[in-house]
């Protein structure tokens, strides 16, 4: 991602980790292994496991009587925290509190890092991390080239510390689903605390329901968060998520790949369930995205979606729900900084059709 031109008061520099929890955390670990992640380290004093693929760090928190497990009792399988890389964690935390954020009383053990955190969407946490490998261009092995995992975690013997997996390399973006009327409030939260700016705005209508979304982007250009709410009075897919999750939260995580076809092949071979796309979608690809330069038969074979214009192509595919109502997006960018806007309506309508078939929605257009 290219850096933006506006002020970066916290020195944000991307995502550090995503923290997951569940009543059955073992199932999370099995899912992540299917997705190409490797368990590479264990927390020194807590029941927390670090899974890695490329530059993506997933934590599974199974510590009894912890914030994470209390979160799981309320939400089920869920994302209880995310972490932003910042220049100075202490200063970032202080500034966030001064601007109205709610702090979190982080219980730390002996010789454990105290990583400051504030309350985020749905009472999940946003951690501030200022230690990571390669920060400010520091070379490997140099003094100061240290991460939070070097301090708080012990490597699992024999585990590759830099696994390639299925070729997923970075966290591209994540989304929030919020109650109707709260989208602007959460957008202003990120703008006020982190100086995020609106990168995109969507207002998509299906046959029965609609959705609104503000996509917010950080000054570093590496943290992007579309915030979604229902766009009509009819309860649709956003409300279904809110009901299943018992509140607001993170809807999906988008993971980047440099070769989406290879990644999708790996995921399918590992039995990760991916969303289907009707064949007629591909009959219109060349008309909708002329001169895209991709092999339409190869995209059709793998059910990969395409969007953009010539020289600015985005390829994407979505998993089925994997962690409660949470799913994953696999994305490859070829000069395109969007979110697949051209696919949104098609995807939205396909999910809406599934809801109608399951009886969640009633199709009033046929009555």
Residue ranges and their predicted role:
Residues 1-157, 314-316:
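An N-terminus-focused feature that recognizes amino-terminal "leader" regions
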Residues 1-25, 79-82, 140-187, 246-255, ...:
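N-terminal beta-strand motif that seeds the catalytic metal site of vicinal oxygen chelate
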Residues 10-57, 98, 106-109, 117-120, ...:
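Core segments of cupin and vicinal oxygen chelate
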Residues 14-18, 32, 37, 51, ...:
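Short, structured motif recognition centered on aromatic/hydrophobic residues
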Residues 121-123, 132-133, 163-168, 206, ...:
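Contiguous mid-protein beta-loop-alpha structural module that forms a pocket-lining wall or clamp
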Residues 223-225, 246-320, 326-333:
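Long compositionally biased, domain-poor regions of proteins
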Residues 308-314, 322, 326-347, 351-367:
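Long, C-terminal catalytic modules of enzymes
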């Amino acid at each position: 991602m290219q850096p933006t031109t506006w002020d970066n008061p916290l020195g944000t520099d991307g995502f550090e980790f995503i923290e997951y929890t569940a009543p059955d955390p073992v199932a999370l670990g099995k899912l992540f292994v299917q997705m190409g992640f490797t368990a590479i380290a264990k927390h020194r004093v807590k029941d927390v496991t670090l899974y890695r693929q490329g530059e993506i760090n997933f934590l599974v928190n199974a510590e009894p009587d912890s914030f994470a497990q209390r979160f799981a009792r309320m939400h089920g399988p869920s994302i209880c925290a995310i972490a932003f890389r910042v220049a100075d964690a202490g200063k970032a935390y202080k500034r966030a509190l001064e601007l109205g954020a709610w702090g979190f009383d982080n219980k730390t053990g002996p010789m454990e890092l105290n990583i400051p955190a504030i309350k985020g969407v749905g009472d999940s946490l946003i951690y501030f991390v200022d230690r990571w490998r390669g920060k400010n261009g520091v070379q490997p092995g140099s003094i100061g080239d240290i991460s939070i995992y070097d301090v708080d975690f012990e490597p699992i013997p024999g585990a590759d510390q830099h696994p390639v997996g299925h070729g997923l390399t970075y966290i591209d973006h994540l989304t929030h689903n919020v109650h109707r009327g709260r989208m602007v409030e959460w957008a202003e939260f990120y703008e006020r605390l982190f100086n995020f700016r609106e990168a995109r705005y969507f207002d998509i209508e299906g046959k029965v329901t609609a959705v609104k979304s503000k996509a917010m982007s950080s000054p570093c250009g590496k943290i992007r968060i579309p915030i979604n709410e229902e766009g009509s009075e009819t309860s649709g897919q956003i409300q279904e998520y809110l009901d299943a999750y018992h509140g607001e939260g993170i809807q999906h995580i988008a993971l980047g790949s440099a070769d989406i076809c290879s990644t999708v092949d790996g995921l399918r071979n590992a039995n990760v369930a991916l969303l289907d796309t009707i064949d007629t979608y591909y009959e219109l690809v060349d008309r909708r995205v002329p001169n895209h330069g991709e092999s339409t038969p190869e995209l059709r074979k793998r059910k990969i979606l395409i969007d953009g214009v010539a020289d600015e192509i985005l390829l994407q595919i979505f998993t089925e729900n994997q962690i409660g109502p949470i799913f994953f997006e696999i994305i490859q960018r070829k000069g395109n900084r969007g979110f697949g806007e051209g696919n949104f309506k098609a995807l939205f309508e396909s999910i809406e059709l599934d809801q109608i078939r399951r009886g969640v929605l009633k199709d009033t257009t046929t009555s």
